[in-house]
Amino acid sequence: MRVEIIFLGCGGGRWATITQKKATGGFRIHTNELRMHVDPGPGAIVRLNELKISPWRTNALFISHCHPDHYTDGEIIVEAITQGMTKKRGVFLGSLSVVEGFGEYEYVVSKYHQSKLEEVRVLYPGDSAELYDTTIKATHTKHGDPFGIGFRLSTIYGDIGYTSDTEFIPQLIEDFDGVRILIANIVRKKNERIKGHLCSNDAIDLINSMNKKPELLIMNHMGVKMTNPQIEAEYISQNTGIEVIPARLGLKVELLNGKYKYQLIK
């Protein structure tokens, strides 16, 4: 049995995306049955091939909200899922804005591409869906896209949480209490808070408010002003008592029975 997370970058926000000083390819979650790509921003398909991860084996796509650092390679991932649009295959999960569009937010995967998938589903916070050998539950956010979602994925070896882009709101405490691994989109360091996003101090408050803290926090979606992620990870760890590591291109985290391990793949 396997449960693993592989990062195709760690950057987020307009400046990090434009400069590509931190890659913005999102991340993958692989289990025995699931091969899910989460938030494939610019360069996702390039990073997959660089790391020699087969895009063709992908069978699920999750896009959290309608900002380009999360969705731009989505249609290419769909083309991989569907074997070059030749087979009706795979699952696409996303927020209302992502899948159907709403107001100024247009859907980000074309109806043509959506038509080639076996299942397309809109998720709202609190919604759950069976996803191969896992269960996914959408979580709350407060961000520019009012329909944005994160998720909590239940696997054979415990739960993985993903905040997506959000500022600190009380609902996050319940959403992620008890997950084994939490992937938190932390754009800025210390108390340098900006609207719609978490800073390091927000992550500390979130972790310390939980009844059962995660075993591991992974810092993701870091902006250009997050100049020394390792020092920031140590700061968060010192103030929460849990292990904290920054994501980076090629980081692979394996969730095992009663433990976890991580390494860098190239």
From Swiss-Prot:
One protein family per Pfam: Lactamase_B_2
Domain of life where this protein originates: Archaea
InterPro entries: Metallo-B-lactamas, RibonucZ/Hydroxyglut_hydro
Database matches in PANTHER family: HYDROLASE C777.06C-RELATED, HYDROLASE C777.06C-RELATED-RELATED
Protein name: Uncharacterized protein MJ1374
